[in-house]
Amino acid sequence: GLGSLLGSLFKFIPKLLPSIQQ
């Protein structure tokens, strides 16, 4: 459902952020 989709995004975003900041 939508909740699991949002959960996946919130787990995925922190992995992207370090590569963006560096």
From Swiss-Prot:
Function: Has antibacterial and antifungal activity.
Protein name: Caerulein precursor fragment B3
GO biological process: defense response to bacterium; defense response to fungus; killing of cells of another organism
Localization annotation: Secreted
Main location: secreted
UniProt keyword annotation of Lipid metabolism present: no
Organism: Xenopus borealis
Keywords recorded for this protein, A-Z: Antibiotic, Antimicrobial, Fungicide, Secreted
Family affiliation: Belongs to the gastrin/cholecystokinin family.
Any one annotated GO CC term: extracellular region
Domain of life of the source: Eukaryota
UniProt note on tissues of expression: Expressed by the skin glands.
